[in-house]
Structures are given as C-alpha cells and as structure tokens.
Amino acid sequence: MENNILTTLNLSIGYISKKETVTIAQNLNLNLQAGKLTALIGANGIGKSTLLRTITGIQKSLQGTVLLNDKKISSYEPLELAQNLSMVLTEKLPPSNLTVFELVALGRQPYTNWIGTLSDADIQIVQDAIAQTQIAHLSQKKHYEISDGQLQKVLIARALAQDTPLIILDEPTTHLDLLHKVSLLKLLKK
C-alpha cells in the first residue's frame, strides 16, 4: 500500500503575464511517498524550481490539483501548511542581523506562541537540527558572516527544525563540496 504524502493530478505549470501564458510542463501526475527520498533531476531552465514552487503552493498552477495529505494545498491556512511542509529554495535571504542559531530557530515559528518564544523542547529541536547538519561551530555567527555552502546547511537545518512530514529542497547541494554533499544525502536518507 502506498503512503502518498503529496500528489499532483494533471498539473500544468508555468507563468501568466499580461501578454501571454507560458506553459512549461503539463499533465504532471506524481506521488511523493512518506519516508522516501525523491530526487528531481534535469537540465537548467526546464522548470524544476517552478514545479517545486507550484507543488508547495508558492506559485499557482496553470491547471490541475496538488494534494498534501489528501487535501488541496490551496485550502491550507499558512500556519497549518507550515506545520506540514518545509522548504529550502534558492532565493537569497533578505538582509537581517540574525545569528545562525536564530535563523535555524525560525523553523520552530509554526509551533511557538504569538511572540515567538521557544520552549525548552523547541530549543532542543533546534540544537538537534544544528548538530545533524554539523554547524554547531557557526551558531553564534551572523548569517551574513558565513560562506554560501555553510548557509545552505543552515537553511537545511531550519527545515529540519521545522519538523514537518515533508521537506522540499530546491538544489540542496548547491555550494557544497563533495564531502558535504555526501554527508547531506546520508542525512536526508534517514
């Protein structure tokens, strides 16, 4: 029996502008299963990131349906979606003065009170995510003081700290050397 966590039904992806609709891919049917590592591989510019933005609800589909836990992704409230899906995209972070620890701790935001106070359990989850990604030595550095490869690990730690049933990573090994690519893939397989 399949345990599908995310399903697409006849999904068409692309862009709508004032002048035209550009379809990148159409009639996509896929099933992502809980507990499985799934990779999407393809040439640059063919729509992988567009697909990921669409299946996570960031970008509207041109046609079709995306189901997360058998519920339309468009029907999720933002907080509920953040408790079921975490993602790491390729966009740059907005300017801020956050430390690495604080950036990873943002992954706990869907579970904190209205002022964002971390419980002892939240702090432990953040520390575990930092340990799993081997970035403890960076925790007190400002995120703008670290390399792109280190920042990629920090963003993955944030997704792990979010503790969701589904994690979507767009180009997760970008900026990582071979050793850290292997380490990350081993971590993701757990």
Residue ranges and their predicted role:
Residues 41-43:
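The feature captures the beta-strand-to-loop junction immediately N-terminal to the Walker
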Residues 105, 120-138:
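Conserved ABC ATPase "signature" region
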